[in-house]
């Protein structure tokens, strides 16, 4: 199934994705699915079904988070990315039935986006890597 009324904005930190989603949803009286909009579902997730997304929720000792090997961390990021996409698509299935334009700040992988959306409904925004790295922790979020 391809979404006809959903527009995806993907990319790096500081590229302007959140700003673009807000502005487009205001201009077109649409729905803004802002960064991490799927977080509203996390508190009710089963840790067996969503081990990546519930890892930090259920973490007893943050030292365990920091002590992971680079390979373990990478595997967690990859798992969490897949799980986020599942939740986002569940939310978008419901929202898309409202008939409004939906603008999504997302990290859904591009191979998934190519299956669920037309090319002209996907925008990839990239910030200068130096800005993304040097200013990342200046963000309020």
Name each model feature, range by range.
Residues 1-4:
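Phosphate-binding P-loop
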Residues 9:
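Hydrophobic anchor at the beta1->P-loop junction of P-loop NTPases
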Residues 12-15:
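ATP-binding Walker
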Residues 18:
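Walker A/P-loop
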Residues 28-46:
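Short beta-strand-centered segment that lines the nucleotide-binding/catalytic pocket of NTP-utilizing
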Residues 38-39, 108-110, 126-133:
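Conserved nucleotide-binding/hydrolysis micro-motifs of P-loop NTPases
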Residues 41-101, 108:
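ATP-dependent small-molecule kinase phosphotransfer cores
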Residues 116-141:
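Conserved phosphate-donor/acceptor-positioning beta-strand/loop module used by diverse small-molecule
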